[in-house]
C-alpha cells in the first residue's frame, strides 16, 4: 500500500499543514482517526502499534506526505532553488559526480536537486539521521523515484520488502532419514 499527496501551503504553517494532510490521508486509507505520533530515538516520527509508516516534507510553497505499509522517506525541493555547484563534490559519489558532470551546464542545478532529494528521502526512510548521510548512498540521475510535481522535484523511497530466497533443492521426506 502506498499513497502520496500534496497541498499548496497558501500561507499555512508547514508543520500544521503537514499534520492536517497526514490526518486526512490516514483517515482515507484506514477509515479511522489518526493515532498520536511518537518519535523514535533518532527523531523519526511513527504511529505506535500501526503497520503504516509516513514521511512529510515541505518546500516554500507545498507540503508533501507519503504513507506506506513499510518504512518510507520523502523529500522535495523547489525547482527554482539555486544550489552551489560545490555541493556536488561533497555529497555525490564518484559515479554520481560523473553523471552530474555529463549534464549540460544549464541543467546541472536540477540534476543536483534530483540527487539531493533522493539522498534526503533515503536518510528519512532509514531513520538513521545524519549517520547515513549523504555519501553512503548512490543513485542514478534518471532514478524513477524522482518526479516533478508542480514547481517541485520530489523523491519518495520505500524500504524494500524482504526477499526470501529458497536455495534448497526439492527433496523427498525419505532423504531426511
Question: What does each model-found stretch correspond to?
Answer:
Residues 1-177:
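Core catalytic alpha/beta fold that binds nucleotide/phospho-ligands
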Amino acid at each position: 500500500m502506498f499513497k502520496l499527496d500534496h497541498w499548496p501551503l497558501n500561507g499555512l504553517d508547514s508543520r500544521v499543514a503537514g499534520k492536517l494532510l497526514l490526518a486526512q490521508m490516514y483517515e482515507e486509507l484506514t477509515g479511522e482517526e489518526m493515532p498520536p505520533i511518537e518519535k523514535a530515538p533518532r527523531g523519526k516520527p511513527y504511529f505506535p502499534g500501526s503497520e503504516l509508516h509516513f514521511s512529510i516534507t515541505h518546500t516554500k510553497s507545498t507540503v508533501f506526505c507519503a504513507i506506506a505499509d513499510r518504512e518510507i522517506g520523502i523529500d522535495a525541493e523547489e525547482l527554482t532553488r539555486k544550489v552551489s555547484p560545490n555541493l556536488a563534490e561533497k555529497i555525490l559519489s564518484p559515479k554520481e559526480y560523473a553523471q552530474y558532470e555529463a549534464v549540460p551546464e544549464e541543467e546541472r542545478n536540477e540534476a543536483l536537486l534530483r540527487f539531493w532529494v533522493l539522498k534526503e528521502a533515503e536518510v528519512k526512510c532509514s531513520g538513521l539521521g545524519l549517520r547515513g548521510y549523504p555519501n553512503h548512498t548512490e543513485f542514478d540521475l534518471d532514478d524513477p523515484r524522482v518526479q516533478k510535481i508542480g514547481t517541485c522535484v520530489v523523491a519518495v523511497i520505500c524500504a524494500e520488502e524482504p526477499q526470501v530466497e529458497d536455495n534448497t533443492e526439492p527433496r523427498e521426506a525419505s532423504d531426511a532419514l
